[in-house]
Amino acid sequence: MTRLVSRAAAIVLLAAPAAAQDVKQGETLLARDCGRCHAVGRTGDSAHKFAPAFRSLGKRYPIESLEEALGEGIMSGHPDMPEFKFEAGDVGAIIAYLKSIQQP
């Protein structure tokens, strides 16, 4: 039983840095590709008046629901936003980051 608990603890400890790395990667990707218009962090205003702050996206819809759109290509209803399509590994990192910054 002690070995099982030790192994479970080791798995959790090994997963934590990967999760933190995903969050950081997601932040980097969004800052690079979206930060010109959207507020990407926990504070600040979006530079474009119609671009929602990413920390408030969870108020509109579940963050997980963005997974398909991020992987297949995000298209907006307004012409100022270019289409973005992310690789599968990047989508997971972006979702992890977005979840980490949502405000209640």
Residue spans of the language-model regions?
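Bacterial N-terminal signal peptides that target proteins for export
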Residues: 1-9
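Short, structured coil/loop segments at alpha-helix boundaries
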Residues: 3, 20, 27, 87-88
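N-terminal signal peptide c-region/cleavage motif recognized by signal peptidases
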Residues: 15-17
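Periplasmic/extracellular electron-transfer cofactor-ligation site
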Residues: 21-50, 72-79, 101-104
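Extracytoplasmic electron-transfer domains, predominantly the class I c-type cytochrome c fold
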Residues: 53-99
